[in-house]
Swiss-Prot record:
The active site is at D65. This is Fructan 6-exohydrolase. It comes from Triticum aestivum (Wheat). Not inhibited by sucrose. Belongs to the glycosyl hydrolase 32 family. SUPFAM superfamilies: Arabinanase/levansucrase/invertase, Concanavalin A-like lectins/glucanases. Disulfide bonds join C451-C497.
Amino acid sequence: MAARLPLAACVVAFHLCLLLSSLVRSPSTALRRLSEAESSLVRHGHGVGIRPAYHFLPAKNWQNDPNGPMYHNGVYHMFYQYNPLGAMWQPGNLSWGHSVSRDLVNWDALDTALDPTAPFDYNGCWSGSATILPGGIPALLYTGRIDADKEVQVQNVAFPKNPADPLLREWVKPAYNPVIPLPADVPGDNFRDPTTAWVGRDGLWRIAVAAKVGGPNGIASTLIYRSKDFRHWKRNASPLYTSRAAGMVECPDLFPVAEPGVEEGRLGYASGPASGAVRHVLKLSVMNTTQDYYAVGRYDDVADTFVPEVDVERNADDCRTWRRFDYGHVYASKSFFDSSKNRRVLWAWANESDSQDNDIARGWSGVQTVPRKVWLDEDGKQVRQWPIEEIETLRSKRVVGLLGAQVNAGGVNKITGVGAQADVEAIFEIPSLEEAETFQPNWLLDPQKLCEENGASVPGKVGPFGLLVMASSNMQEHTAIFFRVFRHNQKYKVLMCTDLTRSTGRDNVYKPSYGGFVDIDIEQQGRTISLRTLIDHSVVESFGGGGRTCITARVYPEHAENKNSHVFVFNNGTGLVKVSKLEAWRLAMASVNVVHGR
């Protein structure tokens, strides 16, 4: 592949030189600063008790999809869907917010990178991706919404005005946009979200774009486009992947994964898929379920098609049966390759679950999950995720408690010293699995329903056991993250749940139960299972079984305004559970996009 890059480099460089005569400017000049009133609202206003302290969010207003995260010349860039005019989704106002960081934890806000100012995007600059071109020049591919009445979506490109600017503060849109117009066989409102581009063995660039082909009732498709110059794109005859049952998919993401024990950086790519000998992950966000699904499989880099490798209980042709990156309240995830540390990093949008009126009153809405490292599990069937190591720099006071403690049936033990801003790691040991309840096969494809019917307050045999977080002193409010173990075909099935039914005393809040199965052999693990939970006021991210199953939740306890939250270990099963490891840390506040007024 590297031998083919000079052809693409020469052609792309030629077209970049022509930009100065055909630019549509995107205004962006300085750090976005808060007025004194705005800064006061962020620090002291309504809802400050639930505002995250170390998760990524703008100082104010609405954000949704992560767009074009990248590492460039020593700086991390985060672009995101942003409404500069308020704390609600207004599709015609959507811009690309832009922040920069040296460590993926602390962020400085810049002015918006892309605003809906041109004929090819004047009803919204929607989601897309970043690609580092030969010569080190980044490019942004994004969806432009050009007709709100007819809902026409097209694909555009933008480049930095000054590539030598280390912060890439200003971006320009060539007047030759759109680079990909709406296809004749795709409805106007179903063509969006171009991926990071990659170069095939033939020297041509490729991107994938989500579409519904064949009309309003058409087939959910991930289309492939090819180009030699990053300007003129031609659609491939075959889609990368189709799913008739899915309706409409969004925000596709295709990337290679190294076999277990091999660093991803040795695959020899920096921005997209590698050769057909390497296994890949395809992620699709399904609009009618608002969930992200992925499969490990084979990408044919000649035909530009993807074949999922799925278990017998899953359907390769229906992506809604695939595994999920997160079984909680996240959507529109986007990954990038971090060349500085040879790792793939994943972001995802965690929307609010509160009422829109409360979002508006607070003045902000939407956060991103903590950035997660992603790699292929040893079983070759699933990926694992873990908070990037930089999150650990926020750890301050360390608490070691309950080590070796036995939690009897109905027991609740407090972890003293941590509350609403914490990182908790625990390993639970089950002395005996003999009493595990029998698993019913019809539970397999709906773990969330199983969690809803068997919440933390429902006693079981082996479980529920786990953590109670964001808990009030009287336990009337709490969020439960727990496991249940079932007997299944001479082995055991582990269910992980996050139960929000008692997360708040308020009624106008979405309080579901989330759930996913943890694909491990708990007997081979010595009858143990691990849980790591990051607590950040209204955000609770949990990683079960070493990151094989992840659940993110948004919670809004009334007691949070009093800043008096607690963490407990609990066991509501009939058998005892041993806490063989428990470490917890208070986490410091990160500096995230808050700049005091002038």
